[in-house]
């Protein structure tokens, strides 16, 4: 996921001070320019019931890999990917949360700093769709009111086993102010990039112009260091988005 620095071996029999023939005669080796630093650092959290494919979506986007039998996430995990949108370089930190209820006290601490929230259900398992109101309560209780929301019906590759229609997903999203909806397949890599890039684009659209012009800004998009201990939970929000 994170790019690693390349390691160069010393030629056999050579020395650190040796000059290759190609560099003789006054020629100098050009130094490789360091990569441009990110203009913004931004956190996104993926939530949803166990087994809906949250980890698979994250790993497909960050590493372009897919695991048929991924182990359930314990607590939280994260990956980082740098993307470029609207002429800006964004370092995107994606938090993958456990779907089991016993981890809620841990994962809830990561909602507050998320500027985007991806809520995932499995189109082949009605119970994961029925759990969506529970996850919305978590969002309303812990997340920022300004967080962008995206509902994703995953496992579109299992169309023949579908239990939740696209219309049902769209109807649920329409009841939530500002929530977008799409269906995807981590296995077939369908709509995966679009999920994350559209979410980031929506976040950037809401940023003030003076913030967008300020490179390496310490604005509200700044990414905080990965906490070893979950941060203090924010107070409950004054109202909810849905019943």
From Swiss-Prot:
<feature type="lipid moiety-binding region" description="S-geranylgeranyl cysteine">
    <location>
        <position position="243"/>
    </location>
</feature>
<dbReference type="InterPro" id="IPR050305">
    <property type="entry name" value="Small_GTPase_Rab"/>
</dbReference>
<dbReference type="GO" id="GO:0005765">
    <property type="term" value="C:lysosomal membrane"/>
</dbReference>
<dbReference type="InterPro" id="IPR005225">
    <property type="entry name" value="Small_GTP-bd"/>
</dbReference>
<dbReference type="GO" id="GO:0055038">
    <property type="term" value="C:recycling endosome membrane"/>
</dbReference>
<feature type="binding site">
    <location>
        <position position="186"/>
    </location>
    <ligand>
        <name>GTP</name>
    </ligand>
</feature>
<keyword id="KW-0460">Magnesium</keyword>
<feature type="binding site">
    <location>
        <position position="187"/>
    </location>
    <ligand>
        <name>GTP</name>
    </ligand>
</feature>
<dbReference type="GO" id="GO:0032482">
    <property type="term" value="P:Rab protein signal transduction"/>
</dbReference>
<keyword id="KW-0597">Phosphoprotein</keyword>
<comment type="function">
    <text>The small GTPases Rab are key regulators of intracellular membrane trafficking, from the formation of transport vesicles to their fusion with membranes. Rabs cycle between an inactive GDP-bound form and an active GTP-bound form that is able to recruit to membranes different set of downstream effectors directly responsible for vesicle formation, movement, tethering and fusion. RAB12 may play a role in protein transport from recycling endosomes to lysosomes regulating, for instance, the degradation of the transferrin receptor. Involved in autophagy.</text>
</comment>
<feature type="binding site">
    <location>
        <position position="54"/>
    </location>
    <ligand>
        <name>GTP</name>
    </ligand>
</feature>
<feature type="binding site">
    <location>
        <position position="55"/>
    </location>
    <ligand>
        <name>Mg(2+)</name>
    </ligand>
</feature>
<dbReference type="InterPro" id="IPR027417">
    <property type="entry name" value="P-loop_NTPase"/>
</dbReference>
<dbReference type="GO" id="GO:0016239">
    <property type="term" value="P:positive regulation of macroautophagy"/>
</dbReference>
<feature type="binding site">
    <location>
        <position position="51"/>
    </location>
    <ligand>
        <name>GTP</name>
    </ligand>
</feature>
<feature type="lipid moiety-binding region" description="S-geranylgeranyl cysteine">
    <location>
        <position position="242"/>
    </location>
</feature>
<keyword id="KW-0967">Endosome</keyword>
<feature type="binding site">
    <location>
        <position position="99"/>
    </location>
    <ligand>
        <name>GTP</name>
    </ligand>
</feature>
<dbReference type="GO" id="GO:0003924">
    <property type="term" value="F:GTPase activity"/>
</dbReference>
<feature type="region of interest" description="Disordered">
    <location>
        <begin position="1"/>
        <end position="36"/>
    </location>
</feature>
<feature type="modified residue" description="Phosphoserine">
    <location>
        <position position="15"/>
    </location>
</feature>
<keyword id="KW-0968">Cytoplasmic vesicle</keyword>
<dbReference type="Pfam" id="PF00071">
    <property type="entry name" value="Ras"/>
</dbReference>
<feature type="binding site">
    <location>
        <position position="155"/>
    </location>
    <ligand>
        <name>GTP</name>
    </ligand>
</feature>
<dbReference type="InterPro" id="IPR041830">
    <property type="entry name" value="Rab12"/>
</dbReference>
<feature type="modified residue" description="Phosphoserine; by LRRK2">
    <location>
        <position position="105"/>
    </location>
</feature>
<feature type="short sequence motif" description="Switch 1">
    <location>
        <begin position="64"/>
        <end position="78"/>
    </location>
</feature>
<dbReference type="GO" id="GO:0005776">
    <property type="term" value="C:autophagosome"/>
</dbReference>
<feature type="short sequence motif" description="Switch 2">
    <location>
        <begin position="96"/>
        <end position="113"/>
    </location>
</feature>
<dbReference type="GO" id="GO:0019003">
    <property type="term" value="F:GDP binding"/>
</dbReference>
<feature type="binding site">
    <location>
        <position position="55"/>
    </location>
    <ligand>
        <name>GTP</name>
    </ligand>
</feature>
<keyword id="KW-0342">GTP-binding</keyword>
<dbReference type="InterPro" id="IPR001806">
    <property type="entry name" value="Small_GTPase"/>
</dbReference>
<keyword id="KW-0472">Membrane</keyword>
<protein>
    <recommendedName>
        <fullName>Ras-related protein Rab-12</fullName>
        <ecNumber>3.6.5.2</ecNumber>
    </recommendedName>
</protein>
<dbReference type="GO" id="GO:0005764">
    <property type="term" value="C:lysosome"/>
</dbReference>
<keyword id="KW-0449">Lipoprotein</keyword>
<feature type="binding site">
    <location>
        <position position="73"/>
    </location>
    <ligand>
        <name>Mg(2+)</name>
    </ligand>
</feature>
<feature type="binding site">
    <location>
        <position position="73"/>
    </location>
    <ligand>
        <name>GTP</name>
    </ligand>
</feature>
<keyword id="KW-0653">Protein transport</keyword>
<feature type="binding site">
    <location>
        <position position="96"/>
    </location>
    <ligand>
        <name>Mg(2+)</name>
    </ligand>
</feature>
């Amino acid at each position: 996921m994170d790019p690693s620095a390349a390691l160069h071996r010393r030629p056999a029999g050579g020395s650190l001070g040796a000059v290759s023939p190609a560099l003789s005669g006054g020629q100098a080796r050009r130094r490789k320019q360091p990569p441009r630093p990110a203009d913004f650092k931004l956190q996104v959290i993926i939530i949803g019931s166990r087994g809906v494919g949250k980890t698979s979506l994250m790993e497909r986007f960050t590493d372009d890999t897919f695991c048929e039998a991924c182990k359930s996430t314990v607590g939280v995990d994260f990956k980082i990917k740098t993307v470029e949108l609207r002429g800006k370089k964004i370092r995107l930190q994606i938090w993958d949360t456990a779907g089991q209820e016993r981890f809620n006290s841990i994962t809830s601490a990561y909602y507050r700093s998320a500027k985007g929230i991806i809520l995932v259900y499995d189109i082949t398992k009605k119970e994961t769709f029925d759990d969506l109101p529970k996850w919305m309560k978590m969002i309303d209780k812990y997340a920022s009111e300004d967080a962008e929301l995206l509902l994703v019906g995953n496992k579109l590759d299992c169309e023949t086993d579908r239990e939740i229609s696209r219309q049902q997903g769209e109807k649920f999203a329409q009841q939530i102010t500002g929530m977008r909806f799409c269906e995807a397949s981590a296995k077939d890599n369908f709509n995966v990039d679009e999920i994350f890039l559209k979410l980031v684009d929506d976040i950037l659209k809401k940023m003030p112009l003076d913030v967008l012009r300020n490179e390496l800004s310490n604005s509200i998009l700044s990414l905080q260091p990965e906490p070893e201990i979950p941060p203090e939970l924010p107070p409950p929000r004054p109202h909810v988005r849905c019943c």
